[in-house]
Amino acid sequence: MADSSFDIVSKVERQEVDNALNQAAKEISQRYDFKGTGASISWSGEKILMEANGEERVKAVLDIFQSKLIKRGISLKSLDAGEPQLSGKEYKIFATIEEGISQENAKKVAKIIRDEGPKGVKAQVQGDELRVSSKSRDDLQAVQALLKGQDFDFAVQFVNYR
């Protein structure tokens, strides 16, 4: 019988992020407490730019955006938001969407699988993802349950289950 496998990835659908951003922008434009504050959220290249005329307001914009991401099923571990910075009369927050598993994080995950996972399960780093293979599908499901119970500082998805 051939080996079964799945990939561990950290990916975010850009369209879902765009939808969350548009929903947040619409809510900001309609809320009474944001009238006249210059609060906005938009794409700035690959970054997301949030701005308002007060530090509390720009943090509130970030909070709204985070709530929209959660509603769209995107993990907040994928969002890397900076600190509010004063720029002229406005405060700005730049945020990026983190994708891919770094080499050191992939090694940590592989070590957890080796140490705590079932015997006979192999984990190989392939670029920014991790391939886990075994002869038994039950072992692969046990590895998935093990990894879901871990608290990583990056989002984890399982794809290509074969």
From Swiss-Prot:
InterPro entries: DUF520, UPF0234-like_C, UPF0234_N, YajQ-like_sf. It comes from the Bacteria. Keywords: Nucleotide-binding. One of its GO terms (cellular component) is cytosol. Pfam families: DUF520 (PF04461). One of its GO terms (molecular function) is nucleotide binding. The keyword Secreted does not apply. Belongs to the YajQ family. Nucleotide-binding protein. This is Nucleotide-binding protein SGR_2909. The lineage of its organism: Bacteria, Bacillati, Actinomycetota, Actinomycetes, Kitasatosporales.
